[in-house]
């Protein structure tokens, strides 16, 4: 299958992320990530996750996952639309990489009440940086536009203790976007 993968990360208050994480997970960085895919030019898919560590495994924990996501293409722009979210990626013709790749053993997914680690996919194809804009459609949902550069997500010490909150898409999506940190697209065979 040919996969066009689009990835965007945005900064979010790390203390709020800590309050959401399930038992046994620790927040690595103040970041939320949206991964979107077009599979064989026909089917869209989307995931929402945050950087986390569990049992010495550093990577991501999945907050939400959608299949059969509607998408449109126009020129270099690809837009994914859900009732909860709209996100667009526009290739800018500059190749680069992702700083989080070096610190990623995989992603934890919740199934039947248990989190399972799925190893990171090895992708050797070149990545193209993208401009990106997104908006969660929940009341008070995060939204943002990229600045045309990649910014680091630097871990923050705890400064505010929030009450534990349910690990849900809506609770994560209403944490304000401090800044879109970067976005890229890559095409590969899976």
Please give the residue ranges for each predicted region:
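N-terminal domain-onset segments
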Residues: 1-45, 164, 174, 181, ...
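Acidic-enriched, low-complexity/disordered segments with a strong bias for Aspartate over Glutamate
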Residues: 4, 15, 40, 56, ...
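Structured loops at beta-to-helix junctions and adjacent beta-edge loops in soluble globular domains
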Residues: 11, 51-53, 83
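Short, low-complexity, polar/charged sequence segments that are solvent-exposed and flexible
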Residues: 26-29, 50-51, 69, 99
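A glycine-rich, hydrophobic loop/mini-helix early in the fold
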Residues: 40-76
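Interaction-surface and assembly-scaffold signal
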Residues: 71-190
């Amino acid at each position: 299958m040919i996969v066009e993968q689009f990835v965007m990360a945005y900064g979010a208050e790390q203390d709020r992320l800590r309050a959401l994480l399930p038992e046994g997970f620790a927040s690595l960085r103040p970041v939320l990530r949206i991964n979107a895919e077009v599979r064989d030019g026909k089917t869209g898919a989307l995931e929402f996750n945050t950087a986390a560590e569990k049992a010495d495994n550093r990577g991501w924990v999945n907050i939400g996952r959608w299949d059969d996501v509607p998408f449109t293409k126009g020129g270099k722009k690809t837009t994914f639309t859900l009732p909860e979210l709209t996100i667009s990626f526009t290739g800018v013709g500059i190749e680069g990489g992702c700083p989080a790749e070096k610190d990623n053993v995989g992603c934890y997914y919740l199934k039947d009440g248990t989190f399972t680690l799925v190893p990171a996919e090895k992708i050797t194809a070149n990545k193209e940086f993208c401009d990106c804009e997104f908006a969660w459609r929940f009341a008070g949902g995060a939204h943002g536009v990229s600045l045309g550069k990649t910014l680091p997500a630097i871990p923050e010490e705890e400064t505010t203790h929030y009450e534990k909150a349910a690990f849900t898409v809506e609770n994560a999506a209403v944490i304000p976007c401090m800044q879109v940190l970067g976005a890229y697209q890559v095409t590969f065979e899976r």
